[in-house]
Regions:
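Conserved GNAT acetyl-CoA-binding A-motif
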Residues: 121, 128-152
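Active-site rim helix/loop that mediates acceptor-substrate recognition in acyltransferases
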Residues: 26-61, 171
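Conserved acetyl-CoA-binding loop-helix of GNAT-fold acetyltransferases
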Residues: 104-107, 113-130
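Charge-dense, helix-prone N-terminal extensions
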Residues: 1, 12-16, 35-43, 47-49, ...
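C-terminal "cap" of GNAT-fold acetyltransferases
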Residues: 151-164, 170-188
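A short beta-loop-alpha structural element at the N-terminal edge
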Residues: 2-20, 24-25
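Short beta-strand micro-motifs in enzyme catalytic cores
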Residues: 60-62, 98-100, 178-184
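Conserved acyl-donor/pantetheine-binding loop and adjacent beta-alpha core of acyl/acetyltransferases
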Residues: 56, 65, 69-112, 148-155
Length: 188
């Protein structure tokens, strides 16, 4: 399995992972909020993400491949550059460190439960370390003895972050699948 940054030459693979009805879906804009450029230009979410893929550092996401097939996506942003996340009333901002924040994992049907999310997490951590980020944080759920509903597990499972060396910092007021989301962090 290979994990690569979402770059403009990989845009068709980004569309494969996030696409479908191009006017619906998050397109990894939920935490970012609509920036001033998007508002002024009247961009759609896919147009905004395409611009971010071209311009953003770090890229707004990472893609997982098995052979030539794109099988996963991990949405990434930087705390301090994500207006909706930074101003969230349910997920607190711990400090002013520009840690990389993992917002979501999307794994194609047929590839789930095969280590794709774990590979994406490792790839993002390695990229953050190489870029000199002070840390990586995420907001997963802990289903505690039950299987998480796949529709709500997009935030990741706490056990995966535990295995990757993240520490559980606190339980947030945010929920997914009626479970509280944790704030987990790995200092780099």
């Amino acid at each position: 399995m290979q994990v690569l940054p979402a770059t403009i030459d990989r845009w068709p693979d980004v569309v494969t992972m996030l696409g479908g009805d191009l006017d619906k879906g998050c397109w990894c804009q939920a935490w970012r909020g609509r920036d001033e450029v998007a508002k002024a230009a009247g961009e759609s979410r896919p147009e905004t993400l395409r611009r971010q893929v071209q311009e953003a550092a770090p890229p707004p996401g990472y893609l997982a491949y098995i052979g030539k097939d794109v099988v996963g996506w991990c949405g990434v942003s930087v705390r301090g550059r994500t207006p909706r996340l930074d101003g969230s009333r349910t997920i607190p901002k711990l400090d002013d460190k520009p840690v990389w924040a993992i917002g979501c994992f999307l794994i194609r049907v047929g590839y789930r439960r095969r280590g794709v999310a774990t590979a994406l997490l490792a790839g993002v951590v390695n990229a953050a370390r190489e870029a000199g980020a002070p840390g990586v944080e995420a907001y997963p759920i802990d289903p505690v003895g039950r299987r998480a509903n796949a529709n709500f597990a997009f935030v990741g499972l706490a056990s995966m972050f535990d295995r990757a060396g993240f520490r559980r910092v606190l339980e947030t007021n945010a929920h997914s699948d009626h479970l509280p989301r944790l704030l987990v962090r790995l200092d780099l």
